[in-house]
Amino acid sequence: LSQHNPTAKIIVADPKPKFSKMALFQEGWNAHYAGMIDWIGSEFGGENVAVDPSAMTISIDGESINVDACNVIPAMKAGRIAALAGVTDGNWAPVNAADMSTKADADVYVLGDASQQGDMPKSGFSANSQAKVCANAVRGALTGSKIFPAKFANTCWSLINADDGVKVGATYKATDEKIAKVDGFISKTGETADI
């Protein structure tokens, strides 16, 4: 976009007060796309957004903005099937960290974004890690084989431009209450792209 339409503006209206790797993204946006990306969090109206497709406008906290394109991502929650199964509490399905079975029904397993599991972020890597723990537990229950203690990991790389990326990751363990973070790492602001 910066090459084909350098006067374009990207506006991110976010209902949350912060997001993962926020300082890293904002540093990268300023370095590579200065003045092009505006992030509007909940404190500044990001949770009060209306969309008018016929007029090609969005309204943020009552202020109307003309747009050429608009990508609306609604508030996230577990799929309807989880609610119909009766395993949700609010937007998510609370699970037991040892095997990803739901707290409402031990014979129903939920993992990934739909689960309310503790400290792990909602990411594909997290879902894959949770799936392995779940598969190990289900296999053990069905075959009587050893069930190994649940261990989880997550790593997320995000490209800010073709030559600049940031990372975050951690390891986790199952506790009686949740999936709990053991240790982690994250890129630091000010790092050069060659690190």
Predicted regions and their residues:
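C-terminal, flexible cofactor-proximal segment of oxidoreductases
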Residues: 138-195
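A Rossmann-like FAD-binding core segment of flavoenzymes
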Residues: 2-91
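Short, electropositive alpha-helical surface patch
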Residues: 1, 125-133, 163-172
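Solvent-exposed alpha-helices and their adjacent loops that cap or buttress functional pockets
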Residues: 4, 63, 101-102, 150
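FAD-site-proximal beta/loop scaffold in flavoenzymes
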Residues: 64-129, 140
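Alpha-helical scaffold segments in soluble metabolic enzymes
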Residues: 28, 133, 137
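A structure-centric signal for secondary-structure junctions around beta-strands
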Residues: 7, 105-106, 152
